[in-house]
């Protein structure tokens, strides 16, 4: 057997405390306790509807854990590009394409709410302004952390970079697969 570690899930587990939303954040996003509790109640109902016993030892905390995981995985709805970029736009005299390759992303398909994941490479031709390379990856992550399709994800990232940088051109290549 081959095992592949999903770093994203490991990070999600690390960022998500056992207590409901202590400190009001889940994965660096502000979330109300009521939202977590309401989502958890829906997960509990779903678990019952599929025929499981929510009082079973292994499932006692599952609704709350699943609610926190969903909130973390959809944190892109509570983020904005302005906060991500945080003024990290710099003047640049060059005119050669800047490329950020193989940015890993994880998202949920909007059709079945099942995970999909992949890599996206972004290139842009600057027109006097550049952005830190890590910010490009964070912008990808923000849009990926929403219910998505890969075509829209790609378009949103390119459109946002164009808006931020007024680049001469932006291009992306995205490959993804569903679970």
What are these regions (language model features)?
Residues 1-3:
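Aromatic (phenylalanine/tyrosine) cluster motif
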Residues 6-179:
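A domain-level signal for the structural core that forms small-molecule/cofactor-binding pockets
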């Amino acid at each position: 057997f081959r095992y592949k570690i999903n770093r994203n899930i490991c990070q999600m587990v690390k960022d998500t405390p056992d207590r409901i939303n202590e400190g009001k954040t889940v994965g660096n996003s502000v979330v109300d306790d009521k939202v977590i509790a309401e989502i958890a109640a829906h997960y509990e109902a779903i678990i019952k509807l599929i025929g499981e016993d929510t009082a079973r030892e292994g499932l006692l905390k599952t609704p709350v854990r699943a609610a926190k995981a969903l909130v973390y995985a959809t944190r892109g709805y509570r983020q904005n590009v302005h906060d991500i970029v945080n003024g990290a736009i710099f003047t640049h005299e060059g005119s050669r394409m800047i490329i950020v390759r193989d940015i890993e992303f994880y998202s949920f398909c909007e059709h079945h709410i099942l995970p999909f994941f992949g890599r996206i490479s972004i290139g842009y031709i600057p027109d006097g302004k550049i952005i830190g390379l890590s910010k490009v990856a964070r912008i990808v992550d923000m849009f990926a952390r929403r219910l998505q399709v890969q075509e829209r994800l790609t378009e949103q990232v390119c459109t946002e970079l164009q808006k931020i940088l007024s680049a001469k051109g932006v291009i992306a290549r995205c490959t993804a697969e569903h679970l």
